[in-house]
Amino acid sequence: MQALVQVRGPVDMSRDIQDTLEMLNIHSVNHCALVPETDTYSGMVAKVNDYVAFGEPSEAVLTDLIESRGEPASGAGDVDDAWVAEHTEYDDVADLAGALLAEETTLSDAGLAPVIRLHPPRGGHDGIKTPASDGGQLGKHTTEEIDHLLTDMR
């Protein structure tokens, strides 16, 4: 499972890229979606590579992200261990995060909103016009790099 975070805005973005981001449930800057690592999604991720940061997060960071920024699909409330135990088949948020990373379930199937709305990163982006391989923010990240970005955006 990969976490995709849109870091660039819609200015001069082609309609094809906008459509692909909408299909990935990413509708705005600083929104995050979790997508499985299949051939179909790999092609979509490659298409939006110049507008997103993506990588596989660790279970601990995903647990923190769901607890702090996760939202129920309907209604309001905090997503904590009690909510997860009551509304899903998992005992706590850590079990849910593990199932998400193992691609056993999705945020929507678990009763959560399919997108995680994040804050801008504390300390700013490392460069939204430069790929991660050159020290920027765009494109594929290692687990440590995407964990650092998601932690800064909690």
Curated annotation (Swiss-Prot):
Residues 122-141 are annotated as: Disordered. GO terms for molecular function: RNA binding; structural constituent of ribosome. SUPFAM superfamilies: Ribosomal protein L30p/L7e. One of its GO terms (cellular component) is cytosolic large ribosomal subunit. CDD domains: Ribosomal_L7_archeal_euk. One of its GO terms (biological process) is maturation of LSU-rRNA from tricistronic rRNA transcript (SSU-rRNA, 5.8S rRNA, LSU-rRNA). It comes from the Archaea. Gene3D superfamilies: 1.10.15.30, Ribosomal protein L30, ferredoxin-like fold domain. Keywords: Ribonucleoprotein, Ribosomal protein. Pfam families: Ribosomal_L30. Coiled coil: none annotated. Belongs to the universal ribosomal protein uL30 family. PANTHER family: 60S RIBOSOMAL PROTEIN L7 (PTHR11524), LARGE RIBOSOMAL SUBUNIT PROTEIN UL30 (PTHR11524:SF16). Part of the 50S ribosomal subunit. This is Large ribosomal subunit protein uL30. It comes from Halobacterium salinarum (strain ATCC 700922 / JCM 11081 / NRC-1) (Halobacterium halobium).
